[in-house]
Amino acid sequence: MSLQIDAVILAGGMARRMGGDDKGLVELNGKAMIEHTIERIKPQVKEILINANRNQTRYAEFGFTVLSDEHTGFLGPLAGTITAMGHTQADYLLVVPCDCPLLPRDLVARLLAAIEANDAELAVASDGEREQPVVMLLKPSLRESMTAFLEAGERKIDFWYAKHRFAVAAFADQPNAFVNVNTPEQKQRLAAEINQS
């Protein structure tokens, strides 16, 4: 029996470093940032959910279900992940940010292989040097644990997954896969890179 894997694209943040612009909707090479992310992950998953706390109507135009955080107050990636976990029946949920337009085309396969090889509950991506806490594959059954962690006042996703059996999938062969956009300067650099990928 093949596993069902859904994805959530996290676009629920405040984007303070981008001058408050909604990062998923910032244009990059003629497309909204989130469109690049969708193109990368769509062939790898069954359903895509978008977590957004503003501009929901605009995000809905991409043709996917848009979910706002159940926990209000812009509480970060944990809140968006918890919300998505409550809206999927899949075996695993892929979590990615909206501003990583160069995500690996084999992201799911390698995260899943890491889970299976280590009998883990979730796998986190690494660029070969640093873990990427908001790029992970996890079981939706972990929702209760994540909710309790958030409601205890915690926000850091890596502190949460450290409490579980987690594996790391290294993508040292794709060092730019997780480059994201936090400043207009990074956006310019990334635009050039996308043209070459």
UniProtKB/Swiss-Prot annotation:
GO terms for biological process: bis(molybdopterin guanine dinucleotide)molybdenum biosynthetic process. CDD domains: MobA. It holds the Pfam family NTP_transf_3. GTP binds at L10, A11, G12, K23, N51, D69, D99. Its cofactor is Mg(2+). SUPFAM superfamilies: Nucleotide-diphospho-sugar transferases. The keyword Kinase does not apply. Gene3D superfamilies: Spore Coat Polysaccharide Biosynthesis Protein SpsA, Chain A. It is an enzyme of class 2 (transferase). Mg(2+) binds at D99. InterPro entries: MobA-like_NTP_Trfase, Molybde_CF_guanTrfase, Nucleotide-diphossugar_trans. The N-terminal domain determines nucleotide recognition and specific binding, while the C-terminal domain determines the specific binding to the target protein. Belongs to the MobA family. Transfers a GMP moiety from GTP to Mo-molybdopterin (Mo-MPT) cofactor (Moco or molybdenum cofactor) to form Mo-molybdopterin guanine dinucleotide (Mo-MGD) cofactor. This is Molybdenum cofactor guanylyltransferase. The gene is mobA.
